Amino acid sequence: MNILLSRFRLLLAAALAALSWGAQAQLSIEITGAGATRFPVAIPLFENEGSLPRGITDVVRADLERSGLFSLVDMGLVTLPATAVPDLAGVRARGADAVLAGSLYPQADGRYDVRFRLFDTQKQTELGGLSLRMTPAQNRATAHRIADFVYEKLTGQPGYFATRIAYVVKSGPRYELQIADADGMNAQTALASREPIISPAWAPDGQRLAYVSFEAKKPVVYVHTLATGQRHVVANFKGSNSAPTWAPDGQRLAVVLTKDGQSQLYVLNADGSGLRRMATSPGIDTEPAWSPDGEWIYFSSDRGGSAQIYRIPASGGSAQRVTFEGNYNVTPRLSPDGRSLAFITRNNGRFQVAVMDLATRQTTILTDSSRDESPSFAPNGRMILYATESGGRGVLAAVSSDGRVKQRLSVQAADVREPSWGPLTR
């Protein structure tokens, strides 16, 4: 049997596997590996934080610790208000190279003004600060923005804590497309169905998802606007309609159709118009991924006799082979800067996440598990979210692009698959 066709059937079979799922259950995150060198930072309580029903700084601390790049210096019950310069030498003596000072100011409308400043204790300088307005219910969203600020100031890269992830879970005959914060909290159901849901893909605006639903008793591609719940059919041609991926302009999608026989790549507008076939191949072409500059579409194909990754100009033209090591490399996903390619490779019989430097063509295997699938880069390119198996059930995991930081995200007694990491939207 054709190896890519076999893979498609295996993925569909995995989507049909049933384990119990509690609606609105949260993903729990276990840190299984951290960076070799972590930056020591202190995040004491904000002034007046006790007036909130739920805190802020505990979420900031959890975000930074989860990244694997920071170690937290305990400040006890010390409160450092945003209006004063803290004793930086004293904080430095506790072992922190940076410290965050903040205050909450209640407003007449029930909201809070949150002000904070970040200091470098070594150089005895202020690194910057912000003022944010929030309701008490927005404590977690505000905390994620603060953590992003700290992350960017101390690493030079944008943070990813205020982003969202999409994934699919299974409960008996019920499938749910879930949306959650990057830390697994605030999970919401975007779509529930008694038929499989696969291949969620975020639009660049972070407001829409494309996915494949089998509710019509066949795979059909939909685009779903999350704020309104409205959705429309993008591809419902004869045969299979699958593997949607957005162009960087947010106006077009690449999809895989079998309407003319084998699985082949097509591009069409997000409203379903303007269908254009990308190439003609005697084999199976599938799993497209657009490059961030919009110039290339990467995809999996067996056209050369084994499952490998190719790319084709988005404007049309001849395909070029990208992977050459091994005889099974599939599911290409480009880093946000376009410099790296994440994919699934078969290594000694194990399916693992690998990353290729597209300039040097050097490939590094990042995981040590055996049934990985569906890699998805964080919007800053630092982490890669993917699906794997643990204890006989599907879980999500994340690994840093250098392989040093590792996390596992799971739901108690639930099967979780098909992850997709949303874009930065601020």
UniProtKB/Swiss-Prot annotation:
Position of the signal peptide: 1-25
InterPro entries per UniProt: 6-blade_b-propeller_TolB-like, PD40, Tol-Pal_TolB, TolB_N
Keyword entries, A-Z: Cell cycle, Cell division, Periplasm, Signal
UniProt entry tagged with the keyword tRNA processing: no
Any single Gene Ontology cellular-component annotation: periplasmic space
SUPFAM superfamilies registered for this protein in UniProt: TolB, N-terminal domain, Tricorn protease N-terminal domain
Highest rank taxon of the organism: Bacteria
Biological processes, Gene Ontology terms: cell division; protein import
Annotated compartments: Periplasm
Subunit structure, as described in the record: The Tol-Pal system is composed of five core proteins: the inner membrane proteins TolA, TolQ and TolR, the periplasmic protein TolB and the outer membrane protein Pal. They form a network linking the inner and outer membranes and the peptidoglycan layer.
Record-linked HAMAP family: TolB (MF_00671)
Protein family (similarity comment): Belongs to the TolB family.
Reported function: Part of the Tol-Pal system, which plays a role in outer membrane invagination during cell division and is important for maintaining outer membrane integrity.
Full protein name: Tol-Pal system protein TolB
